Amino acid sequence: MEKKLKILITDDSQLLRKKLRAELEGLGCEVIEAENGKEAVMKDLQEKPDGIFLDIVMPEVGGIEALQVIREVNPEIPVIMLSSAGTPQKLMETLKMGALDFIQKPYTSEQIKKALASIRKKV
């Protein structure tokens, strides 16, 4: 039996977190939530998730800044970036910084399953 993955969802939209939580729990994951990048960094350190779904545009600390800090303290953790306003430049920037993948919102169930499979390969 496969290990139950612990996934951190970070998005300022409570509705999106709720939707993504339901999707991931339906796929057998344990889910932790954060509503901004600062909280994501703290929860990464405290909870030790297996992977992170991280929105790019958030108040206080955005996803790109959070990714930089997370990479400094946890360089191996798989991070999937999420954005509704992603440009090719942002996509390339996050991938160069070590993001595993990038999903454009609104996402499909198939994209989440694929991202989860990518995370599973890394843990």
Q: Where does each model-flagged region fall?
A:
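Acidic catalytic/metal-coordinating carboxylates
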Residues: 36-39, 62-65
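Two-component/phosphorelay signaling modules centered on CheY-like receiver
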Residues: 14-32, 119
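Alpha4 helix (beta4-alpha4-beta5 surface) of REC/receiver domains from two-component response regulators
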Residues: 65, 86-101, 113
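Active-site beta3 strand of CheY-like receiver
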Residues: 47-53
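Receiver (REC) domain active-site loop signature in two-component systems and cognate sites
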Residues: 58
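A Lys-centered signature of the CheY-like receiver
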Residues: 105
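Conserved sequence signature across two-component system core domains
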Residues: 10-11, 34, 52
